[in-house]
């Protein structure tokens, strides 16, 4: 059986991980918005526009991959930690679902 201090320590770690992930997602969104705002095509032609769209598409795909990787890492860690966390009234699946819900809410913001 884990002591209350150990449970608090584990919960603190989980919250820190969630906060870091939310901060990273927000930071990636700010970068994307900044890239979108800084696009200036001097002599608009089809090639220049296509090149800029291609760069944006590539950056967006990298952002999506980073988010998916973070979700997978968090989910894996939550499953591992869920086996060691005993919170009265919550199952491992409920703890994992809480973590995923926090990520979804942060992603919507």
From Swiss-Prot:
Q: Give an example GO molecular function.
A: channel activity
From which organism does this entry originate?
Answer: Influenza B virus (strain B/Lee/1940)
User: Membrane spanning segments where?
Assistant: 5-27
Mind telling me which residues the site (Seems to be involved in pH gating) is annotated on?
Answer: 23
The principal localisation class reads virion
Query: What gene makes this protein?
Result: M
One GO CC annotation? membrane
Residues exposed to the Intravirion side: 28-109
Q: What is this protein called?
A: Matrix protein 2
Q: Which InterPro entries match?
A: Flu_B_M2
**Any ranges marked Virion surface in the topology annotation, and which?**
1-4
């Amino acid at each position: 059986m884990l002591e209350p201090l150990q449970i608090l320590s584990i919960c603190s770690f989980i919250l820190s991980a969630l906060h870091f992930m939310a901060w990273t997602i927000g930071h990636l969104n700010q970068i994307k918005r900044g890239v979108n705002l800084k696009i200036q095509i001097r002599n608009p032609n089809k090639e220049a526009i296509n090149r800029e769209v291609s760069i944006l598409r590539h950056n967006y795909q990298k952002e999506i991959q980073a988010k998916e990787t973070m979700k997978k890492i968090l989910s894996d860690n939550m499953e591992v930690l869920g086996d060691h966390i005993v919170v009265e009234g919550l199952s491992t699946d409920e703890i994992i679902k809480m973590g995923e819900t926090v990520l979804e809410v942060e992603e919507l913001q």
